[in-house]
Amino acid sequence: CLACGVNYMDTANYEPENTDDPEWRAIYEKRCKEAGFSAYFDYSWQWAYAKKFEEAGLTALLGSGFDPGVTQAYCAYAKKHEFDTIDTIDILDCNGGDHGYAFATNFNPEINLREVSAPGSYWENGHWVEIPAMSIKREYNFDQVGDKDMYLLHHEEIESLAKNIPEAKRIRFFMTFGQ
C-alpha cells in the first residue's frame, strides 16, 4: 500500500505464511522473550509501519472486523463516555450457530483451529500471562443463545487494548465453540 500510495485496511492482524523464515523467526523469538506470549500473530509487524504511513499521509486501519475491531471501539467509547477508569476487560465471543456440524465456526476454520490449539494468554498487571491451550473454561449464559462453554484464548485485540487502555489491570478474551 505504501508503494502504491493507497490507504490500508484489514480485519485481523498479520500472521506469517512461513513461520520457518529465518528473518521472521528471529523477530518472533525476540518478541516471545520480551513480551511473554508465543502466538504467531501479533501487531508488532504492522505497528512498525505507523510512522511510514503517517509520513506518507496515508491511513492504515488495523483489525477492523468485529473482534478485533468493534470490541476495541466499544472499549474506547466506554473509557471516554461511561467510566472514569477501566479495571477489567473481558471479551466474550459467542458463536451461537452450529451449521449442522459438531465444530461450528463463523470464520476461517484453519485459523480457528490454530487459535484453539495455541497457548492462551491474557494481560494482567502490566504483563502477559501465558497458559496451556484451552485450560481456562467458563460457562456463561448468553441472552438468546443460552448457556455456552467458553475458553480463554490469545486474541490480537488484547494487545491493542493493553496499549491504549494502560490502566486496565486485566484484559482477557473468551470464545465459544460447538461441543
Per-region residue spans from a language model:
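Glycine-/Pro-rich loop/turn segments that contact NAD(P) or position catalytic residues
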Residues: 2-107
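C-terminal catalytic/substrate-binding lobe primarily of soluble NAD(P)-dependent oxidoreductases
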Residues: 81-179
